[in-house]
Regions:
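A short, well-structured beta->alpha microelement
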Residues: 29-49
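Short, charged N-terminal beta->alpha structural module
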Residues: 3-36
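Ser/Thr/Gly-rich flexible loops in soluble cytosolic domains mediating phosphotransfer, phosphorylation
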Residues: 20, 70-100
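Short, polar loop motifs at secondary-structure junctions
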Residues: 42-43, 56-63
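Alpha-helix N-cap/helix-start motif
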Residues: 17, 48, 64, 82-83
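Cytosolic covalent-transfer regions centered on His/Cys nucleophiles
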Residues: 2-5, 18, 25, 64, ...
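Structural signal for conserved beta-strand scaffold positions within catalytic alpha/beta enzyme cores
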Residues: 39, 57, 72-73
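Conserved acidic residues
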Residues: 52-53
Length: 100
């Protein structure tokens, strides 16, 4: 993978999964991180998650062993796109694992 890839995993949360992905893409870009932020709906396709550097789950779907990368639960973003503690955890994980 040449670009840092973040995948937002959701299911029956509908448009919220896309809203979360867009919010995170903007937040990470503003922080200076060039990331490819995509979505994966387990409701439509319960297959292995796409290859990524970081998996963000709106519902429990995959383990780190299955994903092959760090996995964070970001369920609070379903209700509040600005949930500070969750956004901080995501940013810290990206900072820790973003290629130099």
């Amino acid at each position: 993978m040449s670009k840092y890839r973040v995948v937002v995993v959701g299911g029956w949360c509908g448009n919220r999964m896309f809203m979360v992905a867009e919010q995170l893409k903007e937040m990470l870009a503003a922080a200076g991180y060039a990331c490819d932020v995509t979505t994966h709906s387990v409701w439509e396709n319960y297959s292995r998650p796409p290859a990524a550097n970081l998996l963000l789950q709106l519902l429990p779907a995959f383990t780190e062993a299955e994903a092959g990368c760090p996995v964070l639960t970001v369920k609070p973003l379903i209700v509040d796109l600005q949930h500070a503690a969750t956004l901080d955890r995501i940013l810290k994980q990206v900072q820790a694992s973003y290629p130099a």
